[in-house]
Curated annotation (Swiss-Prot):
Residues 25-35 have a biased composition (Low complexity). One of its GO terms (cellular component) is nucleus. This is Serum response factor homolog. Residues 191-210 have a biased composition (Acidic residues). It comes from Caenorhabditis elegans. SMART domains: MADS.
């Protein structure tokens, strides 16, 4: 048996040993149900091709601008560093901020007051409201010579490319001008320290999770702190109102208890029970006893024996008992 036959048999054994996928299944990686992560350890698929159109969602547009602006600045830095090329890059955001990168020879064009005024006048110029946003590509060649002013400008393919792009390719979507006429731009320069910053964004076409976008656009810490303070103040005021209401309810309850009329004494109840058995003479005797008590005559006996203070007719009681026994 030759080596080729041995290799063929080994390959056949490997094919038979590998389990076949059931019908309706694919080898495309799917997120794990328990962790929600793809086999690459991330929640997204990574680099995907996105559609070249204006992003209407403000949060996604802000995130895309931040990543791609930093990415293009890094590319300009790499181009100038690796090839020794003189590079000048300017990016104007929709909030009126201008980000620039320039090599030393071109730095005066963006750092001087004249250059900044020129940039501001160009950005604040009328037009560019979305009717014609096709970029123009122009190439210049500067030759040092003795003739003329020592400079020869050569425009290459700009008109041809503009005509072809307007006739054949679909037009790019409209967008709002970045700067209003009254808005003064703020300049930020990109340097080597920014390039070495690992936390800066990239220009990858990544599929972004909505939760990540919301976390990036939650607002400034000052606004969050103000909202927390307002919530705390409202809670404190509600607690104070509840305490005052409970205190008022307790005081009202106490006042009601004090204002209640005390129930009549047992002596008065007994007198009311015996009123049918009382005669006019007994009532007069009761009045006499009460008058004597006020004058101090035998006051102790009246207070110690409650029956002496009642207008009791003993004869009527005896007659009533006799009638009841006869019946």
């Amino acid at each position: 048996m030759t080596e080729a036959e041995d290799f063929a048999q080994l390959l056949q054994k490997l094919q038979n040993a590998s389990p076949a996928l059931p019908e309706g299944t694919s080898s495309t990686p799917t997120p794990s149900s328990s962790t929600g992560l793809l086999p690459n350890g991330k929640k997204t698929k990574g680099r995907v091709k996105i559609k070249m159109e204006y992003i209407n969602n403000k949060l996604r547009r802000y995130t895309t601008f931040s990543k791609r602006k930093t990415g293009i600045m890094k590319k300009a830095f790499e181009l100038s560093t690796l090839t020794g090329t003189q590079v000048m890059l300017l990016v104007a955001s929709e909030t009126g901020h201008v980000y620039t990168y320039a090599t030393p020879k071109l730095q005066p064009m963006i750092s001087s007051d004249t250059g900044k005024a020129m940039i501001q006048s160009c950005l604040n110029a009328p037009g560019g409201d979305g009717s014609d946003v096709q970029p123009s590509r122009t190439e210049f060649t500067f030759d040092s010579g003795n003739g003329g002013n020592g400079m020869r400008k050569r425009k290459m393919l700009s008109d041809v490319m503009s005509a072809e792009s307007s006739n054949n390719s679909p037009s790019m979507p409209n967008f709002t001008p970045f700067l209003a006429p009254s808005m003064a731009p703020l300049f930020s320069t990109f340097g080597e320290d920014d390039y070495n910053n690992d936390e800066s964004g990239d220009d990858s076409d990544s599929e972004e999770a909505s939760s990540d976008i919301k976390e990036e656009y939650q607002g400034s810490p000052t606004m969050v702190k103000q909202e927390t303070t307002e919530i705390d103040s409202v809670t404190a005021s509600l607690q104070q109102r509840i305490k005052e209401a409970m205190r008022q309810a307790a005081s009202n309850k106490q006042a009601i208890k004090k204002a209640k009329i005390t129930p009549p004494s047992s002596n008065m109840n007994n007198a009311a029970f015996l009123n049918p058995f009382l005669l006019q003479g007994g009532a007069n005797a009761s009045n006499l006893l009460a008058t004597a008590a006020r004058k101090g005559d035998d006051a102790g006996s009246l207070t110690s024996n409650p029956f002496l203070s009642m207008g009791l007719n003993l004869q009527q009681l005896i007659e009533s008992a006799a009638i009841a026994s006869n019946e």
